[in-house]
């Protein structure tokens, strides 16, 4: 099926973010994969996934943070593996575009991403480790 590129919803993202669906698995697969492009400074809100999430940096420079851990920088080829139900955010560096392939699964009960508050400028602006 054709899945067009769309703007990410502002309730769950800060800044301009475009989502380009790559894969929605057919049962029994619950895999979803989306290319996500963030403009400089754009990022997700805090969120978590019931089965975790894997991010593969494709281009530009990005950031990712799991709650309670330092901000990490992502460059093309880098992979971030987010554990199940770990609150986290990810997005572009302040002065760079960033695209990653985001891969996750829904839980067996069908539940997916749980969204929380937007990431503060203070949390976002922390120097990467």
What function would you assign to each model-found segment?
Residues 1-30, 112-129:
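A short, N-terminal "cap"/entry segment at the start of jelly-roll beta-barrel domains
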Residues 18-21, 32-49, 84:
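Conserved short histidine dyad/triad with adjacent acidic residue
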Residues 24, 48, 56, 76, ...:
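Conserved strand-loop elements at the edges of beta-sheets that form or border functional pockets
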Residues 35-39, 48-65, 103-106:
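Short, conserved beta-strand element in jelly-roll/cupin
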Residues 44-46, 64-65, 73, 87-94:
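Short beta-strand His + acidic residue motifs that chelate non-heme Fe in jelly-roll/DSBH
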Residues 68-85:
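Short acidic-glycine-tyrosine-enriched beta hairpin
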Residues 81, 95-115:
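A short hydrophobic beta-strand segment most commonly corresponding to one strand
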